[in-house]
Amino acid sequence: DGIRWLLLDSLEEVNKVPGILGTAQLDWVARELDSAPATPAVIFVHHNVEPVDMGLKDTKALLEVLRPRRQLKCIFFGHTHEWRRFAVDGIHMVNLPAIGYAFKKGEPVGWVRGTPRAAGLTLELRSLDGAHPDHGKKIELEWRANGEGGKRVGRF
């Protein structure tokens, strides 16, 4: 019962912007998810999952591993210093805000409080600037069902 929290290392090379997971970690994720198919799981990784120059080089391979494993519910990532959310094939993609400084004016700096629920997760933005318009706002993530197909929402 509960949620499985899987942490991945996407650093390929120090002082280089893009990241990579590689075959060994992708195989490990598949084995870990396969060992508990009924338990919801989430992944944390530093690099953004969008297939862009500054993100994960192997996003396509990661999604090929995750799409059929319906117990994977969400990927949390950072790297872009943006607070946003979208979904790909029912998998929530949560881009966490920067905790030190924002790249773009208006982006919150802070952290996100996560509260597990039976069929999802409640996220609450905690901005260092209590006057930020998104400070304290909550987002309800609903888990995709283990056996259902997911619709694609997002850019990849």
Task: Give residue ranges: language-model regions.
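Short strand-connecting beta-turns/loops that link adjacent beta-strands
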Residues: G2, A38, R117-A119
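Formylglycine-dependent
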Residues: G2-I3, S10-E12
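His/acidic metal-ligating clusters that form di-metal
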Residues: R4-L6, K16-H92, N146-R155
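A cross-family glycoside hydrolase active-site/sugar-binding cleft signature
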Residues: D9, F44-H46, L96, E124
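Short histidine/acidic/glycine/proline-rich micro-motifs that form metal-
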Residues: E12, N48-V52, I99-Y101
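Acidic/histidine-rich helix-loop elements
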Residues: E12-T23, A102-G106, E140
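Binuclear metal-dependent phosphoesterase catalytic core
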Residues: R84-F156
